[in-house]
Amino acid sequence: MLTITSYFGFLLAALTITPALFISLNKIRLI
């Protein structure tokens, strides 16, 4: 149970961090 919860937490973190990095990279590229 603990591994499943940590896996979903990691997946959620990846889904929130990845778009933020992508947006920041696009902003740097535009400037």
Swiss-Prot record:
It comes from the Eukaryota. It is found in: Plastid, Chloroplast thylakoid membrane. GO terms for cellular component: chloroplast thylakoid membrane; cytochrome b6f complex. InterPro entries: Cyt_b6/f_cplx_su6. The chain crosses the membrane at residues 3-23. The 4 large subunits of the cytochrome b6-f complex are cytochrome b6, subunit IV (17 kDa polypeptide, PetD), cytochrome f and the Rieske protein, while the 4 small subunits are PetG, PetL, PetM and PetN. The complex functions as a dimer. Belongs to the PetL family. Component of the cytochrome b6-f complex, which mediates electron transfer between photosystem II (PSII) and photosystem I (PSI), cyclic electron flow around PSI, and state transitions. PetL is important for photoautotrophic growth as well as for electron transfer efficiency and stability of the cytochrome b6-f complex. This is Cytochrome b6-f complex subunit 6. It comes from Zea mays.
